[in-house]
Amino acid sequence: MTLATLCYIKRDGCTLMVYRNKKVNDIHEGKWNGLGGKFEAGETPEECIIREVYEESGLSIRNPRLCGLLMFPKFKGNDWYVFVFTAGEFTGELIDSPEGRLEWIPDEKILELNLWESDHIFMLWMQEGKILLREIRI
């Protein structure tokens, strides 16, 4: 089992997204995504997302809000559980991310991006302020 986090940072009607184009053999290459990654030993979901967002963007988020849990059975040969957060409070300046190009995308344009098919489902739920608990098969 793999535990991971995902965060969508909000500012002025926009969401910070990363266009994955930097890593070799990245399963997410060419897709837009939120920020996040795998847990380190002993971390809580909140500690993990705060660390991952900082490493990938240079932003220090405060008070991330848990808005869902996604389950990906047998993804890359393993069961993944992904804690999904949003955040609106942060400090810092964007860095040149090791994951890809960071960009503030207007919320009304997000569903037009090249996202994973499943992202369309939970992005709509998040925009409506709903809590999401869903199994997704890729």
Report the location of each language-model feature.
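Conserved Nudix-box catalytic region and its N-terminal flanking loop in Nudix hydrolases
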Residues: 15-51, 55, 138
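Conserved N-terminal beta-strand and adjoining loop/helix that marks the start
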Residues: 1-17, 38
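Charged phosphate-binding loop/patch that engages nucleotide di/tri-phosphates or the phosphate backbone
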Residues: 125-138
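NUDIX/MutT-family hydrolases
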Residues: 84-86, 95-126
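Short glycine/proline-enriched turns and hinge-like loops at secondary-structure junctions
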Residues: 27-29, 77-79, 96-98
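Short, charged/polar surface micro-motifs in flexible loops or helix N-caps
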Residues: 10-14, 23, 88-93, 129-130
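Active-site segment of metal-dependent pyrophosphate-handling enzymes
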Residues: 58-92
